[in-house]
A protein has these predicted regions:
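Substrate-recognition "cap/lid" segment bordering the active-site pocket of phosphatases
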Residues: 75, 97, 103-154, 160-168
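Active-site neighborhood of HAD-like aspartate-dependent phosphohydrolases
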Residues: 1-33
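Helix-loop "lid/cap" segments that line or gate small-molecule binding pockets
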Residues: 19-20, 39-54, 110, 142-143
């Protein structure tokens, strides 16, 4: 969702800067690459471990969500031609699921404001499955919710580890 349909990566880059700055750290050059395929919980654990924070993963996730909520609700836009493409797929009867690392509570207002929420038949977040996008769990669950086999699905993904994970499961 982020980076494929939504032009939202700038939000997460800014959250990384602000979040770590509040704790006296700069964002390491490899940080975004490391946490992107992880789900929220694993990213929070990684952040706590990497920076030696005395905080709970749930608290980091809550803070990140709070920082992102307004941007998603009011500022994040669709990528160029995404709306037209989704509407064309929907009109053709294609079932569409979103397999995302973002919380539904963040993306739903953005998709609704941009006029495409109703294009989706299912949403699966990495918080609902055991692993992040570096494993096929989120893609398999999306196919299951669409009542399709992996071979009947097409995955659009901008994370290399996610592409590899989906491919390993037969997508």
């Amino acid at each position: 969702m982020d980076g494929t349909l939504l032009d939202s990566m700038w939000v997460w880059r800014q959250i990384d800067v602000d979040f770590l700055d509040r704790r006296g750290f700069e964002v390491p050059s490899d940080y975004l690459e490391m946490i992107t395929p992880m789900g929220y919980y694993r990213a929070a654990e990684y952040t706590i471990e990497r920076f030696g924070l005395n905080e709970k993963p749930e608290d980091l996730i809550q803070e990140w969500h709070g920082m992102a909520a307004e941007a998603y609700a009011k500022k994040v836009e669709l990528k160029s031609h995404a709306k037209e493409y989704l509407l064309k797929l929907k009109k053709a009867g294609t079932r569409i699921a979103a397999a995302t690392s973002s919380a539904y509570e963040l993306i739903a207002p953005c998709l609704e404001r941009n006029g495409v929420l109703e294009c989706f038949d299912a949403f699966v977040t990495t918080m609902e499955v055991p692993h992040g996008k570096d494993f096929p769990d989120v893609y398999l669950e999306a196919a299951k919710r669409l009542k399709l086999s992996p071979e009947e699905c097409l995955v659009y993904e901008d994370i290399y580890k996610g592409i590899c994970a989906a491919k390993s499961a037969g997508f």
